Amino acid sequence: MAIYQVIPYGLPVPPNTPHAILVSLPTWNDTVTCIEGEDAETRLSGYPRFFIQVAIRKLASLMERKYGLDGERCMLFPSYRVAEQCRLFVQASFSGVRVVSLLVCQEDNKNARIVECKEDTGLSMQPASENHLHIVLFPTDALPVAKLFWQFTGTGISSRFADHWLSTLPDDVVRTNGISGSTSVQYLTNKSPGDYSVGLELTPLPDAASAKYVLRQRIAGALNVYDRQGGPYAVQENLQVGPNSHGIADVSENDVYLFPTGMCAIWNAHRLSLAVRSAEKSVCFGFVYCDTLKVLEKWGPGCHFFPEGNDYDIDQLEVILEQESARDSTKPPILALYTEFPSNPLLRSPNLPRLRALADKYDFLMVIDDTLGNFVNVDVLPYADIVVTSLSKIFSGSANVMGGSLVLNTNGHHYTALAAYMTAHYEDTYYDEDAICMEQNSRDLQQRIKIIDTNAEALCDFLRSHSVAAGAAKSVIKEVFYPKYKTPENYERCRKTVSNHNASLSSSNEVGGYGGLFSITFISNAASRAFYESLDCFRAPSLGTNFTLAVLYTILAHHDELEWAAQCGVEEGLVRVSVGMENTETLLKVFEVALSTAKKAVATA
């Protein structure tokens, strides 16, 4: 029973969605093909940090031909300061890296001209703007290194930004020989996942400044939850505000900073830590998203890695802290500890009270990524100095825009220094049209999460009852990873009680759910492959969408380090599932069929 038509490999997910950030990976082999990247220059879609989207590729080709030397390639950025960071990163391995900065001057409704800006015009002091484009040019051999910067920092321009520039370029640039003007994609005609929403009233889109202001309010927990139509929107004046939902009384929109991607928020949190504290090693606590570890390793002195993220690892961490403090008591033993709540993909929750106690004792920063737990379900800010979130996931839900946020804990010991640095150095590079889209997508966040949490718990209870871990000895499912079953005592400590302030309803308290993400391991790769390829839902990377997604996570994220990942408990055949808003019974039937198919594959192997 198919929820949606199967989308062929390489096409956007969801279909009929401009600026889709996902790519269809319907089979095991397709996933391997995607990660090997040999078709990256011709594929039509992909996750924007790993894949240069079609509009961006077209604009980059135009810039290479117009401003590049023979044998040069380029990356495009919205800010001179970010472009300089890319130049420095690539220049560490290659010579001949340079930045060209452009300004588009719109002379009237039809005509524009491009002005090349000189370095002595104070570019580093100018705010990012859609009228500025910054090109990092480098030798072709340096392209893989430049792509790493694009991937790890999440600072590149978005497809909407590229479309804006393509629409305003003068004819002498657009008519460059050899550049195809076609960016069309043939979509399927099945039901769009965008239909899975809670039916918010159509309201006028806000201007970008209003959208960003309300996004920051929404993230800070200042706005009332949207549990009825007619709630506060960005375009309304005199917004009604409710109590902060983060457990920190003084956090406001002024303590929230927006970024173009979640990884950009993480990268900036690390740069912030390095700027205000002694540059010691960091700690990566738990098996977190792969690129978080890479950022900690590639910028600064490196990091200590504790893949299990359990109480034993906390004991081992404390040994290191004691040793480093004994060696030099004049400085903190580590710079900062980075962790996820819960972790991706094993959904383990660290013991935040113990970690916070160590942070207070040894004077290091705590940075918590709450993307999987999300604002509605968990309260982690009281334990953190900095909370980072990928807004591209459940906050948006529609898989058509990227975004990230960084929140400072006003009660943190280092808040004054952190806030002062951000006031002096924060640069808003979040493209206006992306912010407007994100604001619109996130208006019904609470209702969507409630539906998704209910669906995910029902699916996990069903699948776990058929797992070896739960006593089903002959099952093909080895284990289900979900916060309800993995380190539940740690998750429960931070599980949120949501106050309902809707005047049309009686006052009540609702407990946050366990989130919409879970992972499954199998007794063999044959079982994993059969289960994955027979799942009648979208099969694509990412998570937190309004529609159900599945992905072969380990193959996609750790293709070149499968043995190392397995040693950390992340098996090759792990299937990660992000649950959507579909009918619960329909989802149960879909997964029951996939389970039956996996059993048959093992029986006939």
UniProtKB/Swiss-Prot annotation:
Required cofactor names: pyridoxal 5'-phosphate
Expression triggers: Expression is highly induced during artificial growth in symbiosis with Populus, which is close to its natural condition.
Annotated metabolic or biological route of this protein: Secondary metabolite biosynthesis
GO MF terms, alphabetically ordered: cystathionine gamma-synthase activity; lyase activity; pyridoxal phosphate binding
Residues recorded as bearing N6-(pyridoxal phosphate)lysine in the entry: 393
Keyword check for Lyase: yes
Keywords: Lyase, Pyridoxal phosphate
Spans traversing the lipid bilayer: none
EC number: 4.4.-.-
Residues engaged in binding substrate: 289
Any Pfam family matching the protein: Cys_Met_Meta_PP
GO biological process, one term: transsulfuration
UniProt KW Protease keyword: no
Disulfide bonds: none
Family, as annotated: Belongs to the trans-sulfuration enzymes family.
PANTHER family found in the cross-reference section: CYSTATHIONINE GAMMA-SYNTHASE-RELATED, PTHR42699
Function per UniProt: Cystathionine gamma-synthase-like enzyme; part of the gene cluster that mediates the biosynthesis of the psychoactive metabolites ibotenic acid and muscimol. The first committed step is glutamate hydroxylation by the 2-oxoglutarate-dependent dioxygenase iboH, and the last step is decarboxylation of ibotenic acid to muscimol by the decarboxylase iboD. The order of the intermediate reactions is somewhat ambiguous. IboA likely activates the carboxylic acid at position 5 to introduce an amide bond, and the flavin monooxygenase iboF generates the N-O bond.
Designated name of the protein: Cystathionine gamma-synthase-like enzyme iboG1
Organism: Amanita muscaria (strain Koide BX008)
Organism phylogeny: Eukaryota, Fungi, Dikarya, Basidiomycota, Agaricomycotina
Underlying gene: iboG1
